[in-house]
């Protein structure tokens, strides 16, 4: 429980109303009640703002006139919300306890205030920094290094010689450093596996979602740069480089040896081919199929939106005739000339 005045001081915001009101939890405008703090970041919700029963809201000066309760006025309510949610977050944190059923190699170096859960396995020559949390059944293979203040949640699998920076979060069932999809085909059609000798390097302040896989490099390293955000069920193939502060939404797949620049946003279910580059500050819409390099910043979209079945059928039928139509247009152009 926090006073509104305390929260405002943490947010560099200005209280409008009762600064002593007590805040117990966070809620949406429509669901909030006494003791709740809410937020409004979208003009679509001004009616909900005016009707909310929240004890306080996070808003900008521009919408203050629609607010009928206590408020903290600031320039970026959404960022303020993130900071308030950190205060109320009950996620596991390191407490220095190592479970008796954890298996830790004698050569591993464990920092101060590290938590290691039941049935977790820490391999030979692993280095774990201070204030690290390792959840139950996580596995950390030989030679891996994990920086300070990183959270490795339950059932995460980290392969050998991976490097993870400080302040990272890796969610349940993610797999980091598995073999990339490298095979050589013989003349008779049979496959020979190519050993994957590179590493995965995850820089500071990176978050990786549940069920995501990041393959180790074949020769060069796979690199996730500082501040990147990767959602659930994303596939990052070998030798890929993800730039600083770039975000990839769920079910996206990035094929091998592709480089994505800094500050990019990749929509969910996108498929990005291998051996291309995407420049800084690129936005790719959801379900897009990117087959060649992007060299100019901007917004790109390459997917069909859902349509009623009959309308879609007509569209496909017309699309099948487009070559014939182009030929006819060219013939007409020749006649006009």
From Swiss-Prot:
Pfam families for this protein: Hexapep, Hexapep_2, LpxD
Record-linked InterPro entries: Hexapep, Hexapep_transf_CS, LpxD, Trimer_LpxA-like_sf, UDP_GlcNAc_AcTrfase_non-rep
Keyword Secreted: no
Keywords, sorted A to Z: Acyltransferase, Lipid A biosynthesis, Lipid biosynthesis, Lipid metabolism, Repeat, Transferase
Catalytic activity reported: a UDP-3-O-[(3R)-3-hydroxyacyl]-alpha-D-glucosamine + a (3R)-hydroxyacyl-[ACP] = a UDP-2-N,3-O-bis[(3R)-3-hydroxyacyl]-alpha-D-glucosamine + holo-[ACP] + H(+)
Top-level enzyme category: transferase
Enzyme Commission designation: 2.3.1.191
Function: Catalyzes the N-acylation of UDP-3-O-acylglucosamine using 3-hydroxyacyl-ACP as the acyl donor. Is involved in the biosynthesis of lipid A, a phosphorylated glycolipid that anchors the lipopolysaccharide to the outer membrane of the cell.
Subunit structure: Homotrimer.
Name recorded for this polypeptide: UDP-3-O-acylglucosamine N-acyltransferase 2
Originating gene: lpxD2
């Amino acid at each position: 429980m926090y006073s509104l005045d305390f929260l405002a001081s943490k947010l560099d915001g200005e209280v409008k109303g009762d600064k002593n009101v007590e805040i117990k939890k966070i809620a949406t405008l429509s669901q909030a009640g006494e003791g709740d703090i809410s937020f409004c970041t979208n003009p679509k919700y001004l009616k909900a703002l005016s009707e909310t029963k929240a004890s306080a809201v996070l808003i900008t000066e521009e919408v203050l006139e629609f607010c009928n309760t206590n408020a903290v006025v600031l320039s970026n309510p959404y960022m303020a919300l993130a900071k308030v949610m950190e205060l109320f977050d009950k996620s596991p944190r390191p407490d220095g306890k190592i479970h008796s059923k954890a298996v830790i190699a004698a050569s591993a170096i464990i920092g101060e205030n590290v938590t290691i859960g039941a049935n977790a396995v820490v391999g030979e020559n692993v280095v774990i920094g201070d204030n690290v949390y390792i959840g139950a059944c996580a596995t950390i293979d030989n030679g891996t290094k994990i920086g300070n203040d990183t959270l490795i949640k339950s059932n995460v699998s980290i392969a050998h010689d991976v490097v993870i920076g400080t302040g990272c979060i890796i969610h349940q069932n993610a797999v980091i450093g598995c073999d990339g999809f490298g095979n050589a085909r013989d003349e008779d059609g049979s496959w020979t596996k190519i050993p994957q000798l590179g590493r995965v390097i995850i820089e500071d302040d990176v978050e990786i979602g549940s069920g995501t896989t990041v393959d180790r490099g074949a020769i060069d390293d796979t690199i996730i740069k500082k501040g990147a955000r990767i959602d659930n069920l994303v596939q990052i193939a070998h030798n890929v480089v993800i730039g600083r502060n770039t975000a990839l939404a769920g079910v996206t797949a990035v094929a091998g040896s592709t480089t994505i620049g800094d500050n990019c946003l990749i929509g969910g279910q996108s498929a990005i081919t291998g051996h291309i580059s995407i420049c800084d500050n690129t936005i790719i819409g959801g379900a897009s199929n990117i087959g060649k390099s992007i060299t100019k910043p901007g917004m790109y979209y390459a997917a069909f939106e859902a349509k009623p079945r009959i309308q879609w059928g007509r569209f496909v039928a017309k699309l099948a005739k487009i070559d014939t139509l182009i030929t006819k247009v060219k013939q007409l152009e020749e006649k006009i000339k």
